[in-house]
């Protein structure tokens, strides 16, 4: 991977891996999260896969396209309080109810409670981080890893996991936030990297 980045001319900067849809947390953001003692896994991708929980949580501060369609409301409308939904399935993109999480054996209540506490704490931390930069955190998605009988956040965030808006953003950024179109991903990656610098 390192040789590939040298050949392609991609910067060695720790903010982004532009070849994939992954986001290596910027040192500034990582340090900010660490101040709150939030457990984020430092393990390798292979270790994460073997110990990864079979669900992800998405904490929303504003309505995304899925929620707006379900609630027949406006996309990006702020919520009064953050809400969450559970994502599972092949690509971790299918919404399922909590009861199915247990009845299908994907998780147990203790795991889910620990994961949801971490997700909400991560959301609060990131909201504050981005608010200081004049931005709004629309939503954050997080996966989880079981390490030494503890649940920790999977630190391998993707750009699509952290959705941030800014009053001066371009129409293409807004389109990416609403529709998640792959052709607008490059603009969003640059936008997020600029905020994380």
Predicted regions and their residues:
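Active-site loop/lid in soluble adenylation, ligation, and acyl-transfer enzymes
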Residues: 1-88, 195-196
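A short glycine-rich, hydrophobically flanked beta-strand micro-motif that places a catalytic Asp/Glu
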Residues: 40-44, 128-147
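A long amphipathic alpha-helix within ATP-dependent nucleotide-binding catalytic cores
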Residues: 107-138
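Short histidine-centered catalytic/ligand-binding loop motif
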Residues: 19-20, 31, 35, 86-118
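A short beta-strand motif that forms the metal-chelation/ATP-contact edge
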Residues: 52-55, 141-169
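C-terminal helix-cap and adjacent tail motif
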Residues: 157-197
């Amino acid at each position: 991977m390192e040789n590939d980045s040298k050949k392609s001319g991609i910067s060695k900067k720790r903010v982004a891996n532009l070849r994939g849809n992954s986001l290596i947390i910027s040192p500034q953001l990582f340090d900010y999260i660490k101040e709150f003692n939030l457990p984020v896994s430092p393990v390798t991708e292979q270790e994460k896969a073997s110990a990864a929980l079979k669900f992800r949580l998405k904490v929303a501060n504003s309505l995304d396209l899925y929620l707006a369609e379900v609630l027949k409301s406006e996309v990006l409308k702020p919520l009064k309080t953050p809400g969450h939904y559970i994502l599972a399935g092949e690509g971790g993109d299918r919404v399922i109810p909590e009861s199915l999480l247990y009845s299908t054996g994907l998780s147990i209540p203790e795991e889910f409670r620990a994961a949801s506490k971490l997700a909400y704490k991560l959301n609060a931390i990131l909201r504050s981080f981005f608010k200081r930069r004049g931005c709004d955190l629309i939503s954050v998605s997080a996966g989880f890893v079981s390490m030494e009988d503890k649940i920790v956040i999977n630190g391998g965030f993707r750009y699509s996991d952290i959705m941030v808006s800014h009053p001066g953003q371009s129409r293409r950024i807004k389109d990416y936030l609403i529709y998640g179109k792959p052709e607008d991903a490059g603009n969003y990656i640059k936008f997020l990297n600029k905020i994380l610098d």
